[in-house]
Amino acid sequence: MNTDPFETFTADELVIPHGGIPSAAQWIMMHESGGSTTAGHLHAQGRGDGTPGNHSSAFGAFQMIEATRKRYMGADYQSTDFSKQYSAASHYVTDRYGSWDAAQRFWVGHHWY
């Protein structure tokens, strides 16, 4: 019985727009959300005093925070549509890192992007 509240997909099960996404984008997505367009985020670390981690506004397949989703998705910032999330993430990555490969290299070093 699956007790995970978020549906997750393997890389082969994803519906990919326009024939595919870069492998670095897929790698980041799988590390961030397991491919779930409805995934929320809970910080694993607490304050060190037994207090659990805090929720963040990160959401979706690429775990973009709310302010970033609003910037790149506008009124659709809460959309669970993969194509919209991927498009927004691609614009964010291009603006911040220049490419998905550069974003992946940053993620490997910092465990976020």
Predicted regions span which residues?
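N-terminal secretory leader/proregion of peptide precursors and effectors
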Residues: M1-G20
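Peptidoglycan cell-wall recognition and remodeling modules
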Residues: G20-Y113
